[in-house]
């Protein structure tokens, strides 16, 4: 009898969890093609995930079904829907862009110069499970760049604990030292293999001129199943008690360097840009 009761409890719990999750898909309203790596955010519960390469994602039912779901994808209008009205297949409307602050044109200059460096000891930063954010570094303009107008490539140092993992890069113009207009209107998705690696991403095809106001390079973690990672760890609670537990995050980790000032580093969280942990990219 005891065995039957235990088995019933397991089946009931499993069934409840299954019904609390739904699979959704995001499609381009015009082409009907999947929209990959869109950010999906439940406002009241601080839950942020991404659609995968096929535009699909699994979303847990929020405590309040009247909560709003925000969908933000590069190249598309932001969509805000009540969870109770959220269809399993959602279409996103492409938007047109007017870039007032950044010039984009054909590149003819073949000379190169590096800006930014890697120095000292680095430390790895994970994304966490529920508090995904963007981490951006500001590169101010210098007169030394007058003869080197176009941004050719970006180099990022990452540490990856799984076989392969993906992340996105975003490029923003600057206004009063803060991130402003998003320059790239398509995903710059990068795949890295296991280990600590320097990865150089060629963006010369975007033909982006270095703005006089400077530019921000932002790193975006992707909350997709293929990036999911767990490991055993000792966890300390608020009372100083230690216990064995499981740490969850999304790979890869971004390697950063601490600096005396964080004025050039910004963190995008809950739809707001704020000064954050200092990090080093290398732009060349």
What are these regions, as identified by a protein language model?
Residues 22, 30-44:
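Short, ordered, surface-exposed loop/turn motifs in non-cytosolic proteins
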Residues 97-174, 221, 225-284:
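Beta-sheet-rich sandwich/jelly-roll-like modules and their strand-loop junctions
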Residues 85-106, 201:
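Extracellular beta-sheet/turn segments enriched in Thr/Pro/Gly and aliphatic residues
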Residues 1-25:
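Bacterial Sec-dependent N-terminal signal peptides
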Residues 22-29, 55-57, 90, 102:
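A short, amphipathic beta-strand motif
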Residues 42, 70-81:
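A short, solvent-exposed loop/turn motif at the edges and junctions
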Residues 46-56:
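Short, acidic Ser/Thr/Gly-rich low-complexity loop/linker segments typical of extracellular
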Residues 166-239:
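Aromatic- and Gly/Pro-enriched, solvent-exposed loop/edge beta-strand patches characteristic
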């Amino acid at each position: 009898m005891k065995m039957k009761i235990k088995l019933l409890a397991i089946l009931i719990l499993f069934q409840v969890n299954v019904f609390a999750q739904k699979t959704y898909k995001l499609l381009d309203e015009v082409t009907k093609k999947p929209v990959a790596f869109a950010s999906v955010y439940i406002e009241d519960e601080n839950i942020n995930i991404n659609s995968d390469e096929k535009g699909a994602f699994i979303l847990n039912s929020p405590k309040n079904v009247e909560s709003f779901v925000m969908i933000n994808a590069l190249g598309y209008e932001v969509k805000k829907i009540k969870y109770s009205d959220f269809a399993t297949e959602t279409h996103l409307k492409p938007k047109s862009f007017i870039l007032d602050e950044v010039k984009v044109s054909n590149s003819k200059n073949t000379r190169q110069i590096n800006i930014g460096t890697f120095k000292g000891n680095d430390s790895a930063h994970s994304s966490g499970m529920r508090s995904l954010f963007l981490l951006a570094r500001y590169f101010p303009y210098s007169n030394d760049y007058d003869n080197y107008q176009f941004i050719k490539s970006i180099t990022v140092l990452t540490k990856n604990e799984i076989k392969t993992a993906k992340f996105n890069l975003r490029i923003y113009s600057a206004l009063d030292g803060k991130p402003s207009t998003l320059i790239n209107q398509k995903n710059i998705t990068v795949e890295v293999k296991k280990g600590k690696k320097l990865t150089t991403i060629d963006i010369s095809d975007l033909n982006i001129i270095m703005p006089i106001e400077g530019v921000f390079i932002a790193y975006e973690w992707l909350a997709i199943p293929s990036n999911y990672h767990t490991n055993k760890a000792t966890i300390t609670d608020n009372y100083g008690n230690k216990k064995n537990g499981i740490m969850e995050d999304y790979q890869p980790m971004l390697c950063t360097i601490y600096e005396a000032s964080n004025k050039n580093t910004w963190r995008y969280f809950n739809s707001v840009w704020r000064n954050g942990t200092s990090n080093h990219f290398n732009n060349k």
